[in-house]
Amino acid sequence: MIDRQNDNLFDLVAPYEPAGDQPAAIETLTKNFEAGAKAQVLMGATGTGKTFTMSNVIKNLNKPTLIISHNKTLAGQLYAEFKQFFPNNAVEYFVSYYDYYQPEAYVPSSDTYIEKDSSINDEIDKLRHSATSSLLERNDVIVVASVSCIFGLGDPREYQNHVLSLRPGMEVERNDLLRQLVDIQFERNDIDFQRGRFRVRGDVVEIFPASRDDHALRVEFFGDEIDRIVEVDALTGEVIGERSHVAIFPATHFMTNDEKMEKAIESIKAELAERLAVLKGEGKLLEAQRLEQRTNYDLEMMQEMGYCSGIENYSRHMEDRQAGEPPYTLLDFFPKDSIMMIDESHVTMPQIRGMYNGDRARKQMLIDYGFRLPSALDNRPLTLPEFEEHVNEIMYVSATPGPYEAEQTDIQVDQIIRPTGLLDPNIEVRPIMGQIDDLVGEINDRIEKNERVFITTLTKKMSEDLTDYLKELGIKVRYLHSDIKTLERTEIIRDLRLGKFDVLIGINLLREGIDVPEVSLVAILDADKEGFLRSERSLIQTIGRASRNEHGQVLLYADKITDSMRHAIDETKRRRTIQEDYNTAHNITPKTIIKPIRDAISMVQSVEHPEEIKMTNEIDLENMSKAEKLEMVERLSEQMRLAAKKLDFEQAATLRDTILELKSEID
């Protein structure tokens, strides 16, 4: 067991002070939580600095914080931002560690069994271990997570009970320490020294913690006593410093002991006998034979090796839980007085709600056809009510909060003023009759002013037809759709900003990374067709694309004003009025955001000259030779590794996609 530090303070480091609506929002949110509020909504318009407000609230409350985002990319962006704001505290990243994951499944119509197949990202596994160990060691922890945080993770009590605490002067036999390391799933390897392994050289034991990728621990013995503990560079062996105490956490989150394993095996055998009787009673002899064969094989593996493939399906037995009881998750590693923040809650909360049902439907099929025992259903994500039971204090953050948030709390704090003084755009509704000719006139006006245009349509065909029509008129236009690869997509956005073309057409321009300050006009065609792409929230998010430019305008082409349109227009007008009044009172003139235009493939800071950011020349794939492409792959691979080391996962992922596309070009 280890004692948790509870007296650390969050130290917010930022080159600017709160501005606009931020000071009032920070004060209100903090005071409400301190007064006992359990749930609040931060309704922050695009570009108002919601992350900075969240950081200030974390600093004021000084509690361990879990921030949940709806995808890995956004979680990576938030992680990087919070790392900058809190360089002296533990900011951790917890997302699914699978690069590739094919879940186990059975398709009865074609009698096809699909084996589970996965590829684990070692870097993310390290970060997950870092997150859980930080939560047990200290109180000044921020964990940025994806929805994977509601999936089973193992019992935190077992994890904590297996922590090895070592100090110089402590009496312990070297061989006893080696046995303890094996018990907590460390592997001995005297040659290939990496995460989760240890090696032995005489009276010296070197341990590579699962939460590190560069520093190892060297434990030096004198007889049966620990003489010295030093932290060393895992690659060079150079001593970094002496340690008076170290806590070595298990190499896996799924810890158990021999007694629990024996009990679990007996429990699995009992369930198997019960299930076989049911299947045979229903005349399902093939299913019964299949289940008996598969389960007995798994039991043999567990008895001999302490492990089997797909052991997570027996997690209920391993953790001694009752049927239907919720699994342990990352949320159980947080102390009771923690705070939760849900980023883009209008998307994230429906995701959390939907995880359980999707998982159950797939598993039920495996159980019905004799591939798994019914207890496999208890290896699952949390249900929404179970998730809510873990909530102490929660803050929903969104530009367009959903109905769930409204049900949970009536406390909504608005953040509408942008520190830049920029206003929400003007909105005009125009008739569908003659919409294209009207739009062409507006496009030409913007081209004369060297500004850009977004057009969003409802169908792929309409996008393609409109693109062809505008090209015939001599307008420089591109079409952005889901088939476009990552590299090409970032280059299209960059070319739009550079003015290589003036109009970008797409179906759903809400995706991250399409914030282009040069865009002064957003045209929404068929705005009165109710549906997902024309809902109130989608319209507000799309309207927000024009809020980065001082001349921002939105045209809604529609023959009638739907409820969604009315609400979106009213909300935008309300925000704009508040922003105008604030600017007048404080004598602020809105200025378009100046955002540097980087190459689609840009050099990460070089190791030799970290102060320099080197840009590659524009890449012309069509005219590059094979040798040049191979050289480019090598250079980009180096940049990708460097970006991952600097924890810039968004950049690393972009570079990875670029490398894959270059390789496919070469092949």
From Swiss-Prot:
Annotated positions binding ATP = 44-51
Can you list the GO cellular component terms from the UniProt entry? cytoplasm; excinuclease repair complex
Q: Which PROSITE patterns match?
A: HELICASE_ATP_BIND_1, HELICASE_CTER, UVR
- Which cell locations does it reside in? Cytoplasm
Give the main localization category: cytoplasm
Q: What does this protein do?
A: The UvrABC repair system catalyzes the recognition and processing of DNA lesions. A damage recognition complex composed of 2 UvrA and 2 UvrB subunits scans DNA for abnormalities. Upon binding of the UvrA(2)B(2) complex to a putative damaged site, the DNA wraps around one UvrB monomer. DNA wrap is dependent on ATP binding by UvrB and probably causes local melting of the DNA helix, facilitating insertion of UvrB beta-hairpin between the DNA strands. Then UvrB probes one DNA strand for the presence of a lesion.
- Name of the protein in its database record: UvrABC system protein B
Q: Which organism is it from?
A: Latilactobacillus sakei subsp. sakei (strain 23K) (Lactobacillus sakei subsp. sakei)
From the UniProt record, report the name of the gene that encodes this protein: uvrB
